[in-house]
């Protein structure tokens, strides 16, 4: 196989977040509104914009070597691909999306078994059919082209299976979550033949490592300071860190340099304590990656 990796960027709600994640990871991806072929500053890669709903199929067929899609759509299509890693990010938050069974707020539905013989509207038809079939609950599942919440409000169906992060839109429409059917996060998937190719596998693993390290660094900062030798133990005891703080001697001095990594929101608590304990020259700096 040639040393060129064909990669799928998810088009739609994940598009901007994915491009930004690649940027933080060291790749510049440029997307034109009139093209489905983004540019990327990597001579070993080409990119295509593909709907997440179709990504698994194209990866399975080797139209592309690898791509990013929601685990929900990989499951929906039952795509025979390699799941390289999962990455928790979305267009609005850093939490997983949930596919939930939803009914009217005033309905008597308490669980899936109460919907025997009912009509359910959803975009995730295949998964929903399998879910109810595995539980021997007969239902009629209809594909929804959108505005799915309105269908159950208007009485066009008895319940819906819809994706949500916060549940706020569901509540705003007077609906109620009956139960969660599946949790989904973006996953990096690879074609099996591409994964078996040593060069392509190494390239895909490189991408996975850097994307995950950028996500791990979000909302984390580094803190560096100088401290007198007799205060080091007290100072390091108040420092949260991924591992023990790094301590090194300053040249020609009995002072030491201390460095630590922590959550950004912890800094406001830690810095005043450090000052009280005698730390000086405190520097906070952003992190791009944590590996």
Curated annotation (Swiss-Prot):
Q: Which Gene3D superfamilies match?
A: 3.30.70.120, Periplasmic binding protein-like II
Q: What does this protein do?
A: Catalyzes the condensation of ATP and 5-phosphoribose 1-diphosphate to form N'-(5'-phosphoribosyl)-ATP (PR-ATP). Has a crucial role in the pathway because the rate of histidine biosynthesis seems to be controlled primarily by regulation of HisG enzymatic activity.
User: What's the gene?
Assistant: hisG
| Keyword terms of this UniProt record | Amino-acid biosynthesis, ATP-binding, Cytoplasm, Glycosyltransferase, Histidine biosynthesis, Magnesium, Metal-binding, Nucleotide-binding, Transferase
Q: Which organism is it from?
A: Pelobacter propionicus (strain DSM 2379 / NBRC 103807 / OttBd1)
Q: Metal-binding among the record's keywords?
A: yes
Q: What family classification does the UniProt entry report for this protein?
A: Belongs to the ATP phosphoribosyltransferase family. Long subfamily.
Q: Cellular location of this protein?
A: Cytoplasm
Q: What does the entry list under GO cellular component?
A: cytoplasm
Q: What is its EC number?
A: 2.4.2.17
Q: Which cofactor does it need?
A: Mg(2+)
Annotated protein name in UniProt: ATP phosphoribosyltransferase
Annotated GO molecular function terms are: ATP binding; ATP phosphoribosyltransferase activity; magnesium ion binding
Main localization category:
cytoplasm
């Amino acid at each position: 196989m040639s040393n060129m990796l064909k990669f799928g960027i998810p088009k739609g709600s994940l598009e901007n977040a994915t491009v930004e994640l690649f940027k933080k990871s060291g790749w510049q991806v440029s997307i034109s509104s009139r093209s489905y072929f983004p540019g990327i500053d990597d001579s070993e890669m080409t990119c295509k914009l593909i709907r997440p709903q179709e990504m698994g199929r194209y990866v399975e067929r080797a139209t592309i070597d690898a791509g990013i899609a929601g685990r929900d759509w990989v499951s929906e299509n039952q795509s025979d691909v390699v799941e390289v890693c999962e990455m928790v990010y979305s267009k609005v938050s850093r939490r997983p999306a949930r596919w939930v069974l939803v009914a009217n707020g005033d309905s008597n539905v308490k669980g899936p078994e109460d919907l025997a013989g009912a009509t359910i509207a959803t975009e995730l038809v295949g998964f929903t059919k399998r879910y109810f079939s595995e539980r021997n609950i007969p239902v009629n599942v209809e594909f929804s082209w959108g505005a799915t919440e309105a269908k159950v409000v208007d009485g066009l169906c008895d319940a819906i299976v819809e994706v949500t992060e916060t549940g706020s839109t569901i509540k705003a429409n007077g609906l109620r979550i009956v139960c969660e059917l599946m949790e989904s996060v973006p996953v990096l998937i690879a074609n099996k033949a591409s994964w078996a190719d040593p060069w392509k596998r190494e390239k895909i693993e490189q991408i996975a490592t850097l994307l995950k390290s950028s996500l791990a660094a979000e909302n984390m900062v580094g803190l560096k300071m100088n401290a007198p030798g007799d205060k080091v133990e007290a100072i390091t005891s108040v420092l949260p860190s991924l591992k023990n703080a790094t301590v090194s001697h300053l040249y020609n001095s009995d002072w030491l340099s201390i460095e630590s990594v922590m959550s950004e929101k912890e800094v406001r608590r830690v810095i005043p304590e450090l000052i009280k304990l005698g730390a000086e020259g405190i520097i906070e700096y952003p992190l791009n990656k944590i590996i």
